């Protein structure tokens, strides 16, 4: 038996602060509860006046009944507030089912992408804004919230909107159920719920100090620029450009971060230099991370829900939410302990005296605001060069696998293979290592000059050398280049003929089913491409097209792909499966994971319990499906998070 659920809720806390913070707020309540058992009609309970039926409550506690919702993580979180001891293991998420098929993340967009007869009620946004969000009081209406009795007709519409959401969710589930991922993915999803519910403790003393010091720094920089420029608002790009054009004697095209950095590297007047330095201070967007932490921290002193399961299209990797752990600034300071204490003292002058750039210190300390509970420490372990290891394993590029087996430096080995000379880090031909590193990061998925330039952001490699480096890298890695071609050929053949194709690399299977092109990974998980077809690319050559999210425009429509891109999807997906499997093993060994970032796991453990060495051993254990893949990890133990 299945029970499909959708809830409408109210909270004074904005949902953008995170679902856990939203539900944690004392004003949170479930307004409407729509449900349907199996094929029964959808019922809606108005929880502002009626309790849930006993049959529904019993089902919430019954482990034999599967509970489903479109964004089940939210429904589970809401119901936990009312029924903390109910069953939260036999839940399935229809949104994850859609994401597994590389469909959009929202109910409305999935129904449109699948071209279902059932559609989400378009009145929803207006009704949510009216009943589920606080209103601004006015002189004529001092109320801070709209209640059902304030607008009975709208409330009736809201009930129907809630009902329709379950109708659409059930239609989506019915369409996609035969494409369910392997059972292990449900275990990964449940583990993801545990990690998000557990959350990470925040050092609020550090966060508050960072925000206070930043306010002082911004005020000082603003006043300084006002005096130097005479501008009323020196943070206005238009006003500042006019002033700079007059002082420099030529027109600046743009005022991006890179433009400011390039100007500061030149011989410019001292007042211009100071104004540009102030501009950098005023443009320090990293401070928003501290504000996000302050807004998201819950009553238990922790931030929850920072990871989105299957958040990355096609690869299935996790995506960041709330604080966006995936793009936290790096730290380079040698003594983080001292820097943290000075920041907590809120002494901006001392920060300036010790480090020369208080704003940069605040930026570097963002990671350290995430701390372990008293009596605990973080064990942080990160897979080493996992994508390079995975692509070498799949492509059977033996010399690369030998490098990893011997514990070598892949950047040095790559440069040595390209230039046919020994290369040692800080040793013989050490200057070539950087070229090897850039090539490794840029060329693994068919990238060319553009990819090299993007990876070599500082322009350390002369442009005239790039074509030669690209050619040398490809000649040194013929099995990887063959992987691109084989993936491209297999996908096109399947789309053209409808017949399945296996390629030698990883014994990966390409096949077509129910309107999707599927790529079956070694783990058994599948990558999906909706409505695949063949078309012509901008060069006039045959290309693979499918319906998907345009990552630039963020719209659903035609997307083009090719062999190198398919290999990137495959490699990143295999790396994701390695991480997921390792986290499940760690959890079964008793380790409490509080976060993970890219290929790194963050564990909170009591002091004296567990060890980094054991964590690394568990992470690098092989699975039956990745035999021969040489994994390695490194890490550290510390009372706060940082980049080692």
What does each of the following model-derived ranges do?
Residues 176-188, 578-598:
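Active-site palm subdomain of RNA-directed nucleic acid polymerases
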Residues 11, 73-85, 99-101, 241-248, ...:
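Short active-site loop/helix that positions an aromatic residue
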Residues 24-35, 39-177, 334, 408, ...:
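Active-site-proximal helix-loop-helix substrate-binding element of RNase H-like nuclease domains
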Residues 1, 58-61, 361-377, 584-588:
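A short acidic-Thr-Gly-centered motif at the start of a beta-strand
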């Amino acid at each position: 038996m299945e029970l499909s659920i959708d809830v409408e809720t109210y909270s004074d806390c904005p949902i953008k602060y995170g679902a856990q913070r939203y539900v944690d707020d004392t004003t949170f309540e479930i307004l409407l509860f729509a449900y349907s058992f199996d094929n029964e009609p959808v019922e809606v309970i108005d929880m502002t006046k009626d309790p849930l039926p006993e049959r529904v409550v019993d089902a919430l506690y019954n482990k034999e009944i599967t509970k489903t919702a479109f964004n089940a993580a939210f429904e589970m979180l809401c119901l936990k507030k009312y029924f903390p001891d109910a069953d939260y293991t036999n839940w399935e998420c229809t949104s994850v089912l859609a994401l597994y098929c590389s469909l959009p993340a929202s109910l409305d967009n999935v129904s449109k992408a699948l071209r279902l007869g059932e559609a989400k009620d378009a009145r929803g946004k207006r009704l949510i804004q009216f009943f589920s969000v606080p209103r601004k009081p006015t002189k004529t209406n001092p109320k801070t919230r709209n209640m059902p009795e304030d607008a009975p007709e709208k409330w009736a519409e809201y009930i129907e909107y809630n009902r329709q959401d379950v109708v659409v969710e059930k239609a989506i589930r019915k369409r996609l159920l035969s494409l369910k991922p392997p059972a292990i993915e449900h275990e990964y999803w449940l583990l993801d719920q545990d990690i998000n519910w557990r959350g990470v403790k925040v050092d609020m003393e550090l966060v508050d100090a960072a925000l206070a010091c930043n306010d002082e720094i911004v005020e000082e920089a603003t006043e300084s620029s006002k005096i130097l420029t005479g501008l009323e608002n020196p943070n206005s790009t238009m006003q500042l450009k006019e002033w700079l054009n007059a002082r420099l004697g030529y027109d600046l095209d743009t005022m991006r971060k890179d433009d400011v950095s390039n100007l500061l590297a030149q011989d410019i007047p001292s007042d211009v230099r100071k104004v540009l330095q102030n501009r950098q201070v005023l443009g320090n967007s990293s401070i928003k991370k501290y504000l996000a932490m302050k807004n998201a921290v819950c009553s238990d002193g922790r931030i929850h829900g920072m990871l989105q399961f299957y958040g990355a299209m096609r690869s299935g990797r996790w995506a960041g939410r709330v604080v966006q752990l995936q793009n936290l600034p790096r730290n380079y300071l040698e003594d983080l302990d001292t820097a943290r204490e000075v920041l907590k003292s809120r002494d901006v002058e001392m920060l300036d005296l010790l480090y020369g750039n208080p704003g940069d210190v605040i930026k570097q300390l963002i990671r350290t605001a995430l701390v372990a509970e008293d009596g605990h420490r973080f064990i942080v372990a990160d897979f080493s060069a996992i994508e390079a290891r995975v692509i070498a394993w799949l492509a059977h590029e033996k010399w690369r696998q030998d490098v990893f087996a011997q514990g070598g430096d892949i950047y040095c080995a790559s440069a040595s293979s390209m230039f046919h000379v020994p290369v040692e880090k800080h040793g013989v031909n050490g200057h070539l290592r950087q070229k090897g590193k850039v090539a490794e990061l840029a060329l693994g998925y068919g990238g060319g000059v553009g990819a090299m330039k993007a990876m070599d952001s500082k322009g350390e490699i002369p442009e005239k050398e790039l074509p030669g480096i690209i050619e040398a890298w490809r000649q040194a890695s013929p099995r990887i280049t063959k992987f691109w071609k084989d993936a491209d050929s297999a996908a096109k053949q399947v789309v053209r003929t409808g017949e399945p194709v296996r390629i030698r690399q990883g014994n990966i299977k390409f096949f077509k089913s129910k309107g999707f092109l599927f790529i079956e990974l070694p783990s058994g998980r599948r990558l999906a491409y909706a409505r695949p077809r063949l078309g012509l690319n901008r060069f006039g050559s045959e290309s693979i097209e499918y319906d998907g999210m345009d990552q630039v425009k963020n719209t659903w429509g035609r997307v083009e792909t090719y062999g190198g891109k398919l290999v990137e999807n495959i490699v990143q997906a295999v790396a994701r499966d390695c991480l997921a499997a390792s986290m499940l093993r760690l959890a079964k060994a008793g380790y409490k994971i509080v976060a993970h970032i890219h290929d790194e796991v963050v564990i909170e453990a009591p002091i004296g319990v567990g060890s980094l060495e054991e964590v690394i051993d568990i992470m690098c254990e092989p699975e039956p499906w990745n035999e021969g893949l040489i994994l390695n990890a490194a890490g550290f133990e510390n009372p706060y998070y940082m980049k080692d």
